[in-house]
Design a protein with these regions (language model features):
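Bacterial N-terminal signal peptides that target proteins for export
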Residues: 1-9
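Intrinsic disorder/low-complexity detector
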Residues: 7, 21-22
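Bacterial N-terminal signal peptides
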Residues: 9-17
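N-terminus-centered regions that define maturation/targeting leaders and the start
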Residues: 22-200
């Protein structure tokens, strides 16, 4: 995988204090039973088109992946989850999911759980304007897009941030003025690839 495709994940992980590798003991780690880090995600995670104006590039079922995390940093009160496609919209990027206020007691999401509003998180606002998981609509005939998932452990109380925040607004809350991430305790990330060889 080329390094340029990991820009958002790496930048977020470094900025929010991710260190080491998933193989290291006691490292904050994000995993999925739906796909392996750096591998192709299944068709079902792609958007169905229901929240995209019936975009013909949306060929899936909008089933959100399963996620779990371990070795949560000390002092964590809630988590932020961000999903983005840096290659979407011709390189302008697409933010697919912004979720925060995930209580520290939550250790993961089952498959399909966050493709709708849930009391396990506060919904932000992605590029498509929805506050829940909105899967890939990768154009056919392109190289695989790299969908980044970043989980940030924070010291925010679960209800501290209002609903409807964008990714940029959330990251500004975590690291005011683009300076030190004063509200982050650590971060973990994954990359899932998606390629569209299907027709609706």
């Amino acid at each position: 995988m080329q390094a340029k495709h990991l820009t958002f994940t790496v930048a977020a992980a470094l900025a929010f204090g991710l260190g080491g590798t998933a193989a290291d003991a006691d490292v904050f780690t994000l995993k999925s039973a739906t796909f392996e880090d750096g591998q192709i995600m299944p068709k079902k995670v792609a958007n169905s088109g229901a929240n995209t104006g019936n975009n013909p590039n949306c060929v899936g079922e909008n089933v959100s992946p399963q996620f779990s995390w371990t070795n949560v940093p000390d002092g964590t009160k809630s988590f932020v989850m961000l999903m983005a496609d840096p290659e979407g919209r011709g390189g302008a990027g697409v933010v697919h999911w912004v979720a925060y206020g995930i209580p520290a007691s939550v250790t993961g999401f089952v498959e399909g759980e966050v493709a709708k509003p849930s009391d396990k998180y506060v919904g932000g606002r992605g590029t498509r304007g929805v506050g829940f998981y909105s899967g890939p609509c990768t154009p056919p005939g392109t190289m695989p897009h790299h969908y980044t998932f970043v989980l940030v452990a924070t010291d925010f109380d679960p209800q501290e941030l209002p609903p409807g925040l964008t990714r940029d607004e959330v990251t500004e809350k975590i690291a005011p003025g683009g300076k030190a991430p004063v509200h982050a305790k650590g971060a973990a990330g994954m990359v899932g690839l998606f390629v569209n060889p299907w027709k609706r």
